[in-house]
Amino acid sequence: MSLYALLLVALGMSMDAFAVALAKGAAVRMPPRKIAATALVFGTVEAFMPLAGWVGGFYAKPFISEWDHWVAFVLLGGLGLKMMREGLSGEAEDVRESKQESLWMTVLTAFGTSIDSMIVGVGLAFMEVNIAFAAAVIGMAATVMVTIGLTAGKAFGVLFGRRAEFAGGLVLIAIGTWTLLSHLGLIQ
């Protein structure tokens, strides 16, 4: 696989994470340090998933391709509904939110946006590619795209407040629904 092709794959794999980061950045105020930490979590998970897929290879492919869209749909849909509910409630998020809960939600969201990367890893198992390098490139692309998404979302969120959280929830549900419908062959 050429470097150009790998960069395109990495960019494609990071687009779901970018959309989620844009929504999250609009909904929650994050200091630069938190943006960097969140981007690193997404990048790490996004880099790990193709490695896991590569290791699983063709043994996991039938199971993963059969259920990945349902997992993404449930995770992103559930997170989206939670964000919409919070956006409608009008209650400000508790600034003293538990660090463990915050980390858990970040990891869960990162996992939900990177399931397709695992399938890419399965495909990479059948190609001439340095999987460690490919995973690093995919992880770095996700880190950069999440940083951009959170930063751009932060500027957007200042303008639109709680409505942005509701819209962010809609984005998550749309991503999950699109993933499900495209895997079922109902849309392209």
UniProtKB/Swiss-Prot annotation:
<dbReference type="GO" id="GO:0005886">
    <property type="term" value="C:plasma membrane"/>
</dbReference>
<feature type="transmembrane region" description="Helical">
    <location>
        <begin position="35"/>
        <end position="55"/>
    </location>
</feature>
<feature type="transmembrane region" description="Helical">
    <location>
        <begin position="140"/>
        <end position="160"/>
    </location>
</feature>
<keyword id="KW-1133">Transmembrane helix</keyword>
<protein>
    <recommendedName>
        <fullName>Putative manganese efflux pump MntP</fullName>
    </recommendedName>
</protein>
<feature type="transmembrane region" description="Helical">
    <location>
        <begin position="63"/>
        <end position="83"/>
    </location>
</feature>
<dbReference type="GO" id="GO:0005384">
    <property type="term" value="F:manganese ion transmembrane transporter activity"/>
</dbReference>
<keyword id="KW-0997">Cell inner membrane</keyword>
<feature type="transmembrane region" description="Helical">
    <location>
        <begin position="104"/>
        <end position="126"/>
    </location>
</feature>
<keyword id="KW-0812">Transmembrane</keyword>
<keyword id="KW-0464">Manganese</keyword>
<comment type="similarity">
    <text>Belongs to the MntP (TC 9.B.29) family.</text>
</comment>
<keyword id="KW-0472">Membrane</keyword>
<dbReference type="Pfam" id="PF02659">
    <property type="entry name" value="Mntp"/>
</dbReference>
<keyword id="KW-0406">Ion transport</keyword>
<dbReference type="InterPro" id="IPR003810">
    <property type="entry name" value="Mntp/YtaF"/>
</dbReference>
<keyword id="KW-1003">Cell membrane</keyword>
<comment type="function">
    <text>Probably functions as a manganese efflux pump.</text>
</comment>
<feature type="transmembrane region" description="Helical">
    <location>
        <begin position="167"/>
        <end position="187"/>
    </location>
</feature>
<keyword id="KW-0813">Transport</keyword>
<dbReference type="InterPro" id="IPR022929">
    <property type="entry name" value="Put_MntP"/>
</dbReference>
<feature type="transmembrane region" description="Helical">
    <location>
        <begin position="3"/>
        <end position="23"/>
    </location>
</feature>
